[in-house]
Amino acid sequence: MAFGKVSNWAVPLTALMYAMALVCLPMFAGGSRGLVYAADTDAENYGTVIGIDLGTTYSCVALMRNGKTEILANEQGNRITPSYVAFTDDERLIGDAAKNQVANNPKNTIFDIKRLIGLKYNDKTVQREIKHLPFEVVDKNGMPAVAVTVKGERKLFTPEEISGMVLGKMKQIAEEYLGKKVTHAVVTVPAYFNDAQRQATKDAGAIAGLNILRIVNEPTAAAIAYGLDKTEDEHRIVVYDLGGGTFDVSLLSIENGVFEVQATAGDTHLGGEDFDYKLVRHFLKVFKKKHGVDVSSNAKAMAKLKREAEKAKRALSSQMSTRVEIDSFVDGIDFSETLTRAKFEEMNLDLFKRTLKPVEKVLQDAGLKKEDIDDIVLVGGSTRIPKVQELLENFFNKKASKGINPDEAVAYGAAVQAGVLSGEEGVEDIVLLDVNPLTLGIEVTGGIMTPLIKRNTPIPTKKSQIFSTAVDNQKTVMIQVYEGERAMAKDNNHLGKFELSGIPPAPRGIPQIEVTFALDANGILKVSATDKGTGKSESVTITNEKGRLSKDDIERMVAEAENYQKEDEEIRAKVEARHKLENYAHSLKNQVNGDLGDKLEEDDKETLLEAANDVLEWLEDNSDSATKEEFNEKFESLSQTAYPITSKLYGAGASDATDDEDDESDDYFDHDEL
């Protein structure tokens, strides 16, 4: 870990000389700040690359031809297609046909699958979601799978397979429009999707027969749709993306065709479906109170109610009240209720207000005030809700921009990105700078997480740092990779680990091990470690099997990092003070026992050895219980013992040398240990 500056008088010159001999500076190989998405060299083999908005409730496909972006309609003439898959006795249905028969076939009609993709079965969010779903979700090797009856047989489908079917439908729509095969696509995901969810989305594309060239964050794609013609001075925009199942906020700057994401936040389990469920629960209570019948376990009745709740919600965006009527709802009883906009807003106000927290977060992360924002861009069908618009506009004291279709903006931006990758004319000058949502790092001695790629770093990026061994003759180091905002590694999410072995025997702190994190444009992480002495290297690519974070985990980490920031800083400072003392004591001991020991008088040699050994013995007994102040006191005491001896050895030049080489001394104590 990085130790603080060491005052001149506190560092013995022998240590400085020793540090000069091994010079192990923490090294950072700064990666590219962003990526110019120029036409790929293999673009001629791609054919037409399509852009797909794979939504929780609806999906949309678009493409670029002759410099123009086109949103494609399905066979029903609709420009958005329900993300529904159904299995009947005779066939598989996808899109409108699947959604239209859900009330008669609830157990074999699958929707909201995006809420499950890339997550583990025992994840809290998965368990919460399946309570609302009429179809069966089971545990398949620790991952969720949907159980349906297909032609009389029970079959299991993973979320990737179901999403693959929806992507396949989008591919089919494009192929029918073009009259030729489509093999490559750009697909969008929520900005707060973690690595596992992104990987799972790419897998879904492969299942659909699509090579996913790029995973793009939804609000970033929407910003492209909004800002394509903005070539004047820098424009700062907030993209507020409230869809059917996910919520994202991104703060971007647009200048001369350069789109830079400055901050992103969100909630991968908040959207229009949640507003629907509140209405459903309300109607269930009303019906039970009137008729004494609980229909919550009746799948067909619940499917009917959900369908009508969604219709009512949509109607209330343009009128003050609506009538919800279902003939023969259950047991021959009709359902008939009036719902006002005021009642709908009252029921969902807590959820509407919850969307403002990530808005505040992106402003805070970007170091900006509300007044610095030039435009608010609304994306996602749920932004049509008047109360949502009102809360957001009141927050910024500014009207939101309504110049783009909230249902189509994301697919539009994805198509532009696809056009860039396939070399379409008119988009050559677009530069897209996206960011990673969470800090990535490794565990070092003392359990501290050392960050290599900070939260909100533009991607793709590559960062490297030199580490060393913690004990003499250490032959193997374990690289433990974590994701999160807490100071201690154990409080963050463990992504994976690997060993680098075969390190030649050497004193602690001598081997140089370069750890490199490479985060690609899709947010996929590769970690490698190289022994600089031997050139031996090991690496791991963090994939969906490694268990990246769920939405709840992300929220918990960020919230806990804020709540416990003071506690984290205290723990970090204590561990750093302890390691500074331990390294100093070992350094003195090694030098006295080494070549420099021959130049010392026997009494001085004995004094230094005794002082160093006393500290090391004290550390063995008090390493966990001592305070930061006690470690610092021990460090000062040891320094005061050592300095007069080294000053005497090197005479008046010691002070000057110490001044000149202050940075070198810090480098010695700055080595993180694995």
UniProtKB/Swiss-Prot annotation:
Any matching Pfam family: HSP70
Q: Where does the record place it? A: Endoplasmic reticulum lumen
Region span, Substrate-binding (SBD):
416-516
Region (Disordered) residue spans: 651-674
* Gene3D superfamilies hit by this protein: 1.20.1270.10, 3.30.30.30, 3.30.420.40, Actin, Chain A, domain 4, Substrate Binding Domain Of DNAk, Chain A, domain 1
Any GO BP annotation: fungal-type cell wall beta-glucan biosynthetic process
Please state the span of the N-terminal signal peptide per the UniProt entry.
1-34
Listed PROSITE patterns: ER_TARGET (PS00014), HSP70_1 (PS00297), HSP70_2 (PS00329), HSP70_3 (PS01036)
| Keywords of this entry | ATP-binding, Chaperone, Endoplasmic reticulum, Hydrolase, Nucleotide-binding, Signal, Stress response
How its function is modulated: the record gives:
The chaperone activity is regulated by ATP-induced allosteric coupling of the nucleotide-binding (NBD) and substrate-binding (SBD) domains. In the ADP-bound and nucleotide-free (apo) states, the two domains have little interaction. In contrast, in the ATP-bound state the two domains are tightly coupled, which results in drastically accelerated kinetics in both binding and release of polypeptide substrates. J domain-containing co-chaperones stimulate the ATPase activity and are required for efficient substrate recognition.
User: EC class of this enzyme?
Assistant: hydrolase
Where would I look for the motif Prevents secretion from ER in this sequence? 671-674
Regions of biased composition (Acidic residues) lie at: 657-674
Query: Known catalysed reaction(s)?
Result: ATP + H2O = ADP + phosphate + H(+)
Q: Which family does it belong to?
A: Belongs to the heat shock protein 70 family.
Q: Indicate what this protein is called per its UniProt record.
A: Endoplasmic reticulum chaperone BiP
This chain's source organism reads Eremothecium gossypii (strain ATCC 10895 / CBS 109.51 / FGSC 9923 / NRRL Y-1056)
